[in-house]
């Protein structure tokens, strides 16, 4: 979201605050990724009725209650009979009965209102989409030249998506792969190997998969990231009620705490701070929960119990020994220096 001028302004503000606080602040830039949307309707909105038929096609004609343009030929190339399409964050569900290279005739499984340019998800297939759109490529080059720390890739499906982005980034930023599609879950081990970090983006993941599948997937992905020594972020709808309320629900607080107890390296706000009415309170709440959990003796016990077998390298042995010394003697700082660099 936002123009390059707006992004440059936000970047400058963050760096100014960083200097004022004399504390490093990492900046993560989130690329939009391939967004799939339907076209427009003559009336702006139509009501789809369960059991009736609805067509998606490439025609330029304005949408009606019976059909609408879906300007993505790559979707039709990948569809098959029995495949599902989810529209408007999964509120509308269609099942493909017949399809060709420029159309899909569907039955309406879950009905409701459909309006102009609503998003489309296709959970059953790997779409032949480029990992980066032309807009993404332009944005990527701009923000890397601006000077960011992390780059988040949206809707990755396979390891090749990250490799393509890495070649363009060329070491100017570290790459976070957002796991928000079933295909990414299936290919997670390969994606993890070529990523600098992972974001468990539960929003779209919960649209394309049954919602009850998301918590165990979150737990498994976090554990795999810890085992691989890769940072992992848990994101989306963590304090969703704070978009409109100054206080979170108890369930939301528990959800945030659970993500921390699982071993997440970061917990992330979305609409709460980007578009909500109480952004400062949301950040304060998130921070307070993190401080409380990490000061709980149970947290240390859980992290210790979940530690995997040590690796056998000399570096891992040194780090493990330093950790034991720090814990045993209650050190507040470990000083590390290299001959070719300034002490850090």
Q: Where are the language model's segments positioned?
A:
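Glycine-rich, proline-tolerant flexible connector loops at the mouths of alpha/beta enzymes
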Residues: 1-11, 150-158, 205-210, 271-279
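Active-site beta-loop-alpha junctions enriched in small/polar residues
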Residues: 32-34, 59, 90, 109-111, ...
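Beta-strand/loop-dominated core regions that host nucleotide or nucleotide-derived cofactor-binding catalytic loops
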Residues: 33, 38-140
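Long, charged amphipathic helices and adjacent flexible linkers at domain junctions
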Residues: 119, 128, 176-179, 227, ...
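Conserved alpha/beta-domain cores
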Residues: 128-236, 242-253, 260
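Short beta-alpha connecting loops at secondary-structure transitions
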Residues: 206-207, 238-252, 266-277, 303-307
